[in-house]
Amino acid sequence: MGNGTEEDYNFVFKVVLIGESGVGKTNLLSRFTRNEFSHDSRTTIGVEFSTRTVMLGTAAVKAQIWDTAGLERYRAITSAYYRGAVGALLVFDLTKHQTYAVVERWLKELYDHAEATIVVMLVGNKSDLSQAREVPTEEARMFAENNGLLFLETSALDSTNVELAFETVLKEIFAKVSKQRQNSIRTNAITLGSAQAGQEPGPGEKRACCISL
């Protein structure tokens, strides 16, 4: 998966980061989009997002990654945060079992507000702190399998699997969009309009703000 330019892209995929406060969502975001990591644990209140354009085959995909930035502490996340999301990383801290114990609640909230076709990856973050592990890998992997989720363990600190996590989710979304587009072409059921899933803009056309699965 290569980098593209921010101005030149075929698709925009909105991906949301969800999970308890302090699990490392913001650092996963900054590591993927800017290759940065902050040891400052202070929480920023509000919703923020960063983007990174990557190449999937010959298609340029702009990943728009949204972070709750502390709002989860106050249960203040609204349906607007999930609207239009085609991917999600459900993050827990593998050194704090209580952050894993509530992933089912987060998953329910996600499915209550997002499309059923959303691509979801369960992410056990802070794998660099293996000595302090409280969540066995196989336990989390089994939960992911039983719920139809992708699964990886990551470390935003040392970058382990961060690229792979986002890349895997983006590739899965792209595969779904491509399949939907092919099916639409075969059935001659493409709806004209920039918001149609899988439709690439023509020359001079304004690019779609998001893709819906």
From Swiss-Prot:
Record propeptide residues: 211-213
The record, for Gene3D superfamilies, names: P-loop containing nucleotide triphosphate hydrolases
Q: Which family does it belong to?
A: Belongs to the small GTPase superfamily. Rab family.
Q: In which tissues is it expressed?
A: Expression is restricted to epithelial cells. Expressed in ovarian epithelium (NOE) and breast tissue. Expressed in ovarian cancer; expression is increased relative to NOE cells. Expression in ovarian cancer is stage dependent, with stage III and stage IV showing higher levels than early stage cancers. Expressed in breast cancer; expression is increased relative to normal breast tissue.
Task: Read off the InterPro entries from this record.
Answer: P-loop_NTPase, Rab_GTPases_membrane_traffic, Small_GTP-bd, Small_GTPase
**Residues annotated as binding Mg(2+):** T26, T44, D67
One GO biological-process annotation of the entry reads: regulation of vesicle-mediated transport
Q: Where is this motif: Switch 2?
A: 67-84
- Single GO term (MF): G protein activity
Which organism encodes this protein? Homo sapiens
Coarsely, its chief localization is: membrane
The residue ranges crossing the membrane are none
Keywords, sorted A to Z: Cell membrane, Cell projection, Cytoplasmic vesicle, GTP-binding, Hydrolase, Lipoprotein, Membrane, Methylation, Nucleotide-binding, Prenylation, Protein transport, Transport
Gene (name only): RAB25
UniProt: GTP binding residues: 21, 24-27, 38-39, 43-44, 70, 125-126, 128, 156-157
User: What is the regulation of this protein's activity?
Assistant: Regulated by guanine nucleotide exchange factors (GEFs) which promote the exchange of bound GDP for free GTP. Regulated by GTPase activating proteins (GAPs) which increase the GTP hydrolysis activity. Inhibited by GDP dissociation inhibitors (GDIs) which prevent Rab-GDP dissociation.
Q: What does this protein do?
A: The small GTPases Rab are key regulators of intracellular membrane trafficking, from the formation of transport vesicles to their fusion with membranes. Rabs cycle between an inactive GDP-bound form and an active GTP-bound form that is able to recruit to membranes different set of downstream effectors directly responsible for vesicle formation, movement, tethering and fusion. RAB25 regulates epithelial cell differentiation, proliferation and survival, thereby playing key roles in tumorigenesis.
What catalytic activity is recorded?
Answer: GTP + H2O = GDP + phosphate + H(+)
- Tell me which CDD domains the record gives: Rab11_like
- Has UniProt tagged this entry with the keyword Lipoprotein? yes
The record's PROSITE patterns line, in alphabetical order, gives: RAB
Protein name as catalogued: Ras-related protein Rab-25
The Gene Ontology CC terms held by the record are:
cytoplasmic vesicle; extracellular exosome; Golgi apparatus; plasma membrane; pseudopodium; pseudopodium membrane; recycling endosome
Q: Where in the cell is it found?
A: Cell membrane; Cytoplasmic vesicle; Cell projection, Pseudopodium membrane
SUPFAM superfamilies from the xrefs?
A: P-loop containing nucleoside triphosphate hydrolases
Q: What is its EC number?
A: 3.6.5.2
